[in-house]
C-alpha cells in the first residue's frame, strides 16, 4: 500500500459536480493498492496512520496524532500511485492491484481504519472525482507498507 498523507484544514470530494464527502481539520489520504498487498499491509498501514505524530502540540512541535486531535480522515483510492512513468510516454500500472482485488482491500482498509479512528469519510472507489483541499503546513508524507522491510 502506498499512502500519501496530507495534513489539511479541510478537504472535499465531488462526483459529477456534487459534494460527496467533506472533512474539517485532519488528514487527506490518497491510497494506492499494490498487487502484493494483503491484510498484513492493511493492519500495518492503519496502525501507522492513526498513530503518526504529525499534528502540533502546544509548543508547535509535531507530537500529536490524528486521534489525539480528534481530526477527521478522508480516504480517496488512487491506483495511479502505482503508475510507472520511467519507460515510454504512457504510464503502466502493472504494480497496481486489479480493480476487484483493490476494491476488496480498499473496503478492508476502511473497515479497519474505522475501528481505530471515529471520523472517517471516503471518496467513491473507481469514480472520476474532483478533490480539493487546503494543506496545513504544508505537511505531506508518503508511506509505503512494502518499504517497511527496508527500515
UniProtKB/Swiss-Prot annotation:
Q: How does it assemble?
A: Homodimer.
Top-level lineage group:
Bacteria
Q: What class of enzyme is it?
A: hydrolase
Annotated keywords: Cytoplasm, Hydrolase, RNA-binding, tRNA-binding
Q: What is this protein called?
A: D-aminoacyl-tRNA deacylase
Please tell me which stretches of this chain the record labels as motif Gly-cisPro motif, important for rejection of L-amino acids: 137-138
Output the NCBIfam families linked to this UniProt entry. D-aminoacyl-tRNA deacylase
Task: Report the function annotation for this chain.
Answer: An aminoacyl-tRNA editing enzyme that deacylates mischarged D-aminoacyl-tRNAs. Also deacylates mischarged glycyl-tRNA(Ala), protecting cells against glycine mischarging by AlaRS. Acts via tRNA-based rather than protein-based catalysis; rejects L-amino acids rather than detecting D-amino acids in the active site. By recycling D-aminoacyl-tRNA to D-amino acids and free tRNA molecules, this enzyme counteracts the toxicity associated with the formation of D-aminoacyl-tRNA entities in vivo and helps enforce protein L-homochirality.
Q: Which GO terms describe its molecular function?
A: D-tyrosyl-tRNA(Tyr) deacylase activity; Gly-tRNA(Ala) deacylase activity; Ser(Gly)-tRNA(Ala) hydrolase activity; tRNA binding
E.C. designation(s): 3.1.1.96
Q: Name one Pfam family in it.
A: Tyr_Deacylase
Description of its domains: A Gly-cisPro motif from one monomer fits into the active site of the other monomer to allow specific chiral rejection of L-amino acids.
Extract the Gene3D superfamilies matched here: D-tyrosyl-tRNA(Tyr) deacylase
Q: Which GO terms describe its cellular component?
A: cytoplasm
Could you say which protein family the record assigns here? Belongs to the DTD family.
> Which reactions are catalysed by this chain?
glycyl-tRNA(Ala) + H2O = tRNA(Ala) + glycine + H(+); a D-aminoacyl-tRNA + H2O = a tRNA + a D-alpha-amino acid + H(+)
Localization of this protein: Cytoplasm
GO BP annotation list: D-amino acid catabolic process
Amino acid at each position: 500500500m502506498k499512502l500519501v498523507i496530507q495534513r489539511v484544514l479541510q478537504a472535499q470530494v465531488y462526483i459529477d459536480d456534487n459534494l460527496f464527502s467533506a472533512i474539517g481539520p485532519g488528514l487527506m489520504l490518497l491510497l494506492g493498492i499494490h498487487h502484493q498487498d494483503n491484510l498484513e499491509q492493511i493492519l500495518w498501514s492503519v496502525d501507522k496512520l492513526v498513530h503518526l505524530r504529525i499534528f502540533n502540540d502546544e509548543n508547535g512541535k509535531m507530537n500529536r496524532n490524528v486521534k489525539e486531535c480528534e481530526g477527521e480522515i478522508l480516504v480517496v483510492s488512487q491506483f495511479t500511485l502505482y503508475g510507472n512513468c520511467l519507460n515510454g510516454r504512457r504510464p503502466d500500472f502493472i504494480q497496481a492491484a486489479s480493480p476487484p482485488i483493490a476494491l476488496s482491500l480498499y473496503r478492508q482498509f476502511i473497515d479497519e481504519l474505522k475501528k481505530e479512528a471515529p471520523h472517517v469519510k471516503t471518496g467513491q472507489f473507481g469514480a472520476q472525482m474532483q478533490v480539493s483541499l487546503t494543506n496545513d503546513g504544508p505537511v505531506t508524507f508518503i508511506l509505503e507498507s512494502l518499504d517497511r522491510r527496508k527500515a
